[in-house]
Amino acid sequence: MIHGKTLAEWQQSHPEIRELTGLRECAWFNPAAAPAAEALPDVGLGAADIADASARLRRFAPYISRAFPETAASGGIIESPLLPVPAFQQALARRRGRELPGRLWLKADSHLPISGSIKARGGIYEVLKHAEDLALANGLLQPGDDYARLASPEARSLFSRHGIAVGSTGNLGLSIGIMAAKLGFQAAVHMSADARQWKKDKLRAHGVTVVEYQTDYSAAVARGREQAARDPDCHFVDDENSIHLFLGYAVAAERLKAQLAEAGVRVDADHPLFVYLPCGVGGGPGGVAFGLKQAFGDAVHCLFAEPTRSPCMLLGVLTGLHDKVSVQDFGIDNRTVADGLAVGRPSGFVGRAMQRLIDGYYTVDDDELFRLLAMLEQTEGLRLEPSALAGAPGIARVLEENQGYRQRMGLDADRLACATHLIWATGGSMVPEAEMDGYLRRGRALLG
């Protein structure tokens, strides 16, 4: 029995579960998706909260610029490029044997400075927020001060008496570990069995304590949370429930809005924007989607992408059970090459807060991630890790859906011809060359 019903009963009441348990790629367009004005209050946060987070990141820019010289050119603002990928779009169209109208772009969070993934947004933001709180409470900072003073020996001495811990499959741990260690905190990252060895090695090289588990992500988070709870001076970054992480991700939307405007891209009802977000536990894509809905309202359509073996958010929202259900409950093993998305139980906070704001959810097979990885490198010269390619099939999934979604949303041929499609590329620039070469070899072999 699974939450009071047999598997057959679940498959009868929710036919999509047959596809999920069969590990087949599928898409589900959310019949409960509602207008932004109606659904945004579900989140319990608003535009003022995002503005507060954005202002905090600006206050920290002088410190970031000093501590991480690679950010000096951007004035200490951690941001990624927006790239057109027309050759990749043509390759996708050829492979589908059909036109893919609209224009395809890629948001290269894979190339964010400091930790090379989307987690540099939420993870670093939460560490900075905690550092600011401590510095203000201890008289080290006054409102209006130059935050570059947080690079001082006095600041390091203060932070060294405090710990920061997190549970991670890899990328969140990298962003939090690197930032916390740089400030002087005692940093600990609790890593699941899925975490890549190079990510553990990189953290240790930064002086971060890495605690390894032979269990999955949810168990690593639970153990990390328990250990941190025993130390009053340790701040635990809770990927499943953190509002600070969520807001750090949400700031991305206002920056994307400026980049699109600079590129001459219109976004309105007649020029819709589709954004395809890889989803693990849900904090990153949830926060970004929340920001996007605040920035663009109903003109933006957000879809979450998950591996066929780790469809935790789709399963949680589809059944309405959210974090009460895991993929393992349905016999799905949560073993995927997309290590950043290898999560069996979704964030209950994100699932409930965002369930009327996300247009759809789809799954991607591991082999397909490798094929797309090789295609992107071949057509655009961009190298991403497998997780980061989950957004790439999104354009075809939207244009080929047969669930009445486009009709319900008023997405006719004219609007689709003027649409912008955006793959949110979540990581990859820090993958060691030998490992990346292995990914490419596998992808090319699968393409044949």
UniProtKB/Swiss-Prot annotation:
Q: Which UniProt keywords apply?
A: Lyase, Pyridoxal phosphate
User: What are its cofactors?
Assistant: pyridoxal 5'-phosphate
Report the residues modified as N6-(pyridoxal phosphate)lysine: 119
Is Lyase given among the entry's keywords? yes
Does this UniProt record's set of keywords contain Acetylation?
no
Q: What is its EC number?
A: 4.3.1.18
* InterPro entries associated with the record: D_Ser_am_lyase, Ser/Thr_Dehydratase, Ser/Thr_deHydtase_PyrdxlP-BS, TrpB-like_PALP, TrpB-like_PALP_sf
Q: Where is the signal peptide?
A: none
- SS bonds (residue pairs): none
Spell out the reaction equation it catalyses: D-serine = pyruvate + NH4(+)
Top-level taxonomic group: Bacteria
- One protein family per Pfam: PALP
Query: Among the record's GO biological process terms, what is one?
Result: isoleucine biosynthetic process
Name the Gene Ontology molecular function terms of this record: D-serine ammonia-lyase activity; hydro-lyase activity; pyridoxal phosphate binding
What SUPFAM superfamilies is this protein classified in? Tryptophan synthase beta subunit-like PLP-dependent enzymes
Q: Which PANTHER family match?
A: D-SERINE DEHYDRATASE, THREONINE DEHYDRATASE, MITOCHONDRIAL-RELATED
Protein family per UniProt: Belongs to the serine/threonine dehydratase family. DsdA subfamily.
Instruction: Identify this protein by name.
Output: Probable D-serine dehydratase
